[in-house]
């Protein structure tokens, strides 16, 4: 199965559509079955490059009113023409498609439950794998076109076995400033910063100062809610503590945002409530849980959270372009632009929704080169003992999360952590089976999710590939 989160950037019309009258090779202009008709209708909609036409097809034939992945593939590929049919019956077909703008092929599988049905039970489109240089070339082409349209400013690095396969950056720190974003430009990390919190806690575990299965009340002795104080460090690290969100990141949470400067301020806003569910009973992603972990770091170490991370992670890993600047000191950080995840058409700066500074839940800054240094240092034992690094990056009670790291097992085994907020997007993952790290830092909505998919889908074969 594909594991990175599907990109969710809402697209406008394609910049390079194939004309709707272009017919697929080896296919009749007069469909003879309902499946033929569905295929012709799909190809016409995709090749139109028109968002409304594509949505109408998916709504009618697949009960999917907002097929974001298909919209992105239509735009990234500039449309399709048939290369050849691999298989075709009255109820199913598999066809390989050429792409106008990108190297390689895409595979489309269509199926209906019964001959004559118009509703599809299977509609699966995905790029076919390419050699390293092909996957990287495709990713760069997608990034180039996004940047040309003002939809991507940021940096990408791909490394294998410690050697750099690709590195590039796009855009300016401020539009029109002439200050180009580079691989050393610090960029907002959003929730990717949770990895720093996890490593910090595990360092304190290694030092014998924190126990994973101890309740947070052992360290935060004056915590205001007795039930929340019983939640363990481990449950917060793997999002099974029921701690909930922090109430400062939404567009409508500006009043809370204005009040918050420190972790203690966040606890003042959120500390009175109990867990949202019995701790350990289920998994629910929680920003507030990592705020509590940050408070434990401060209490046990005697250092402010940002100072601890600087001394114990950034400095040892050689991360000279990383930190936790406040909102008044972001001149060197690229300005993010957002459409509030499709809530509006116009892009606006994300400054109104930025918290005062990054925290233990995320939001610090690092350059692409620094993130590469962090990923390169983690497995060496310099930041964590090997056994704790292994524990952090393997699935536990939560199949997709370790201790502060998003993980996956199987042939696409990986560890890392993405981050998404208004006007910022991060995708940073290490794929263990091919010893490859993909790093994308962006200053736009959901753009790095889209770019890691462009690379990932062309790097790993489909799980059901038979040749």
List each model region and its residues.
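Short, surface-exposed loop or secondary-structure junction motifs
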Residues: 174, 226-422, 426
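Exposed beta-sheet edge and beta->alpha loop/turn motif
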Residues: 89-136
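Structured C-terminal helix/loop/strand segments within mature extracytoplasmic catalytic/sensor domains
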Residues: 133, 421-467
């Amino acid at each position: 199965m594909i594991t990175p989160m599907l990109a969710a950037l809402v697209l406008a019309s394609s910049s390079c559509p194939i004309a709707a009258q272009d017919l697929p090779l080896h296919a009749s202009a007069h469909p003879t079955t309902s499946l033929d008709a569905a295929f012709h209708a799909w190809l016409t909609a995709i090749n139109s490059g028109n968002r409304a036409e594509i949505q109408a097809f998916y709504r009618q034939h697949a009960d999917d009113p907002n097929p974001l992945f298909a919209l992105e593939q239509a735009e990234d590929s500039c449309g399709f023409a048939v290369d050849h049919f691999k298989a075709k019956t009255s109820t199913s077909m598999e066809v390989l498609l050429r792409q106008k703008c990108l190297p390689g092929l895409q595979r489309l599988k269509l199926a209906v439950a019964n001959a004559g049905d118009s509703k599809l039970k299977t509609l699966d489109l995905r790029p076919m794998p390419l050699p390293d240089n092909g996957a990287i070339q495709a990713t760069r082409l997608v990034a180039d076109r996004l940047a040309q349209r003002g939809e991507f400013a940021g940096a990408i690095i791909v490394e294998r076995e410690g050697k750099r396969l690709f590195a590039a950056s796009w855009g300016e720190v401020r539009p029109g400033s002439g200050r180009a974003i580079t691989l050393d430009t610090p960029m907002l990390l959003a929730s990717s910063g949770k990895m720093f919190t996890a490593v910090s806690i595990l360092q304190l575990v290694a030092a014998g100062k924190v126990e994973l299965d101890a309740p947070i009340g052992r360290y935060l002795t004056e915590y205001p809610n007795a039930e929340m104080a019983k939640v363990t460090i481990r449950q917060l690290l793997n999002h099974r503590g029921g701690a909930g969100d922090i109430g400062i990141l939404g567009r409508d949470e500006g009043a809370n945002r204005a009040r918050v400067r420190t972790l203690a301020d966040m606890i003042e806003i959120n500390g009175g409530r109990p867990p949202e569910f019995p701790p350990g009973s289920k998994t629910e992603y929680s920003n507030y849980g990592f705020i509590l972990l940050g408070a434990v770091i401060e209490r046990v170490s005697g250092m402010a959270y940002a100072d601890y991370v600087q001394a114990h992670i950034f400095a040892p890993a050689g991360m000279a372009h990383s930190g936790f600047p406040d909102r008044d000191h972001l001149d060197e950080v690229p300005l993010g632009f957002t459409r509030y995840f499709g809530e509006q058409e116009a892009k606006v700066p994300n400054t109104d929704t930025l918290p005062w500074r990054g925290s233990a839940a995320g939001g610090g800054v690092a350059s692409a080169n620094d993130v590469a240094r962090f990923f390169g240092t983690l497995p060496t034992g310099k930041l964590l003992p090997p056994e704790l690094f292994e524990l952090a990056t393997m699935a536990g009670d939560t199949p997709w999360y370790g201790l502060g790291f998003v993980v996956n097992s199987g042939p696409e085994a990986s560890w890392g952590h993405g981050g998404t907020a208004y006007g910022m997007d991060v995708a940073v993952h290490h794929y263990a089976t091919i010893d490859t790290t993909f790093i994308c830092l962006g200053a736009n909505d959901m753009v790095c999710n889209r770019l890691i998919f462009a690379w990932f889908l062309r790097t790993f074969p489909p799980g059901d590939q038979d040749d």
